[in-house]
């Protein structure tokens, strides 16, 4: 039986519409609290404690209060971190030996969306069976704990400062960032009071943008999903590099001094090359079905095995664990370095890239010399919820035609989003015009069949 509420990255939707409503989120907090309280890891006679962090959406206040009430009703204590990047919640949950962490965020989505995602005590995303147990509790009546058994809530002192120090600890002690001018784009999101301090305290001349959240402007024309603002700022300020995070700061895009943008695929290659230089060998790395073919070829040329996971950082993580490897990434900017953090972290990933540049004495362009990405065209087609795109003969025919034309010189990938009713059509080809033409033909077939 499939999960009803949990997608690839927690529970997400439009605020005010199921399931992102205050009554549902209260019941979700209660259900999660009951599952935690019944865990074998909670000592008899003690009560679990969870950490709640959020991004800067106006709805975060409402959902935070609802979650807090639900946990308290289940007899679970709550610590409130306030605005905090998703990887910051994962780190603090592990560092403070808490029972779980919860993030209120819809990541790169606009302000009118929000979501809830959970981390286990070790800072990893919840396993499927735990999410299933929470969903099962949602069907049960809410039975409030007795007055002397209610959970308590308190603010976590200096949550931001604790996480800042963790981020800095992942940068080599022998290095500093003095002499570097960096533009840091925080997407008006959760890292707005954190990321600029990390890079400044390591010595960089920091020019922050996207650091004036008002509850409504998260990811709006700024951040990792809208890098044009960063490109302009890097050029205008004659900066050495630009670093763009998304709303919850688990994604990274980098811009060099010329305005060239580097995505997660390219940054993965840079980190693997750096690891080879320092450790002598990297057995393998993980990308996704969307990873550019040129990166796979380049890694294999370096003697590095490459595995493609399903799209979603949780699936990249699964493959890394299965193979015992450290480095993986998505083109969207989720980068995993498991010897540094248990989850994707935009700030930590940026520091790893900067350390690689320091060690090599090269620019990003120089480190990627010889890696020419195949042109890709990605079209997101919004569908009616529940539309049967897999059963459409017209969509299948369009895909077959494109694959036949690109045989041996490109790829076609069609997949449904795990967080919204969108079908992602991606075509990769040696010639950009071919990628665009085939992607648009398939997208037209999808629109005709599903809207």
UniProtKB/Swiss-Prot annotation:
Cofactor needs: Mg(2+)
Keywords from the UniProt entry: Isomerase, Magnesium, Metal-binding, Phosphoprotein
PROSITE patterns cross-referenced by the UniProt entry: PGM_PMM
E.C. code: 5.4.2.10
Active site: 107
Chain sites annotated for binding Mg(2+): 107, 246, 248, 250
SUPFAM superfamilies given in the database record: Phosphoglucomutase, C-terminal domain, Phosphoglucomutase, first 3 domains
MF (Gene Ontology): magnesium ion binding; phosphoglucosamine mutase activity; phosphomannomutase activity
Catalysed reactions, as listed in the record: alpha-D-glucosamine 1-phosphate = D-glucosamine 6-phosphate
GO CC terms: cytosol
Residue(s) carrying Phosphoserine: 107
Function in brief: Catalyzes the conversion of glucosamine-6-phosphate to glucosamine-1-phosphate.
Name the record gives this protein: Phosphoglucosamine mutase
Species in which this protein is naturally found: Burkholderia lata (strain ATCC 17760 / DSM 23089 / LMG 22485 / NCIMB 9086 / R18194 / 383)
Gene (UniProt): glmM
């Amino acid at each position: 039986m499939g999960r009803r509420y949990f997608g690839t990255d927690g529970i997400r939707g439009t605020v005010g519409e199921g399931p992102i409503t205050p009554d549902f989120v209260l019941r979700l907090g209660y259900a999660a609290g009951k599952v935690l309280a019944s865990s074998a890891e909670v000592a008899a006679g003690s009560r679990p404690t969870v950490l709640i962090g959020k991004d800067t959406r106006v709805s975060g206040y409402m959902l935070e209060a609802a979650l807090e009430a639900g946990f308290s009703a289940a007899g679970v204590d709550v610590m409130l971190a306030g605005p905090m990047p998703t990887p910051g919640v994962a780190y603090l949950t592990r560092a403070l030996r808490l029972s779980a962490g919860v993030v209120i965020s819809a990541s790169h989505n606009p302000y009118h969306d929000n979501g809830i995602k959970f981390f286990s005590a070790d800072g990893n995303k919840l396993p499927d069976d735990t999410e299933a147990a929470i969903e099962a509790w949602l069907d049960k009546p809410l039975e409030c704990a007795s007055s002397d058994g209610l959970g308590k809530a308190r603010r976590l002192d200096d949550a931001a400062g604790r996480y800042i120090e963790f981020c800095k600890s992942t940068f080599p002690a022998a290095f500093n960032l003095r002499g570097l001018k960096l533009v840091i784009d925080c997407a008006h999101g959760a890292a707005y009071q954190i990321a600029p301090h990390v890079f400044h305290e390591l010595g960089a001349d920091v020019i922050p943008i996207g650091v004036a959240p008002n509850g409504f402007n998260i990811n709006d024309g700024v951040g990792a999903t809208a890098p044009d603002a960063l490109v302009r700022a890097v050029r205008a300020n004659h900066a050495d590099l630009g670093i763009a995070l998304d709303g919850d700061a688990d994604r990274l895009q980098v811009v060099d001094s010329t305005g060239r943008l580097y995505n997660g695929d390219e940054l993965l290659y840079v980190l693997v090359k750096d690891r080879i230089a320092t450790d002598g060998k990297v057995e393998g790395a993980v990308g996704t079905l969307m990873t550019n073919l040129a990166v796979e070829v380049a890694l294999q040329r370096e003697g590095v095995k490459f595995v493609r996971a399903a799209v979603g950082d949780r699936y990249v993580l699964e493959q890394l664990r299965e193979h015992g490897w450290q480095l993986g990434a998505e083109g969207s900017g989720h980068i995993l370095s498991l010897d540094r953090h248990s989850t994707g972290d935009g700030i930590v990933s940026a520091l790893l890239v900067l350390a690689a540049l320091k060690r090599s004495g090269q620019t990003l362009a120089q480190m990627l010399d010889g890696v020419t990405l195949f042109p890709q065209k990605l079209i997101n087609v919004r569908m009616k919820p529940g539309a049967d795109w897999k059963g459409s003969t017209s969509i299948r025919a369009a895909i077959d035609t494109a694959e036949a034309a690109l045989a041996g010189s490109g790829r076609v990938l069609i997949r449904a989003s795990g967080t919204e009713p969108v079908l992602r059509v991606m075509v990769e080809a040696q010639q950009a015009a071919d990628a665009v033409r085939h992607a648009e033909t398939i997208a037209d077939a999808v629109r005709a069949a599903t809207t």
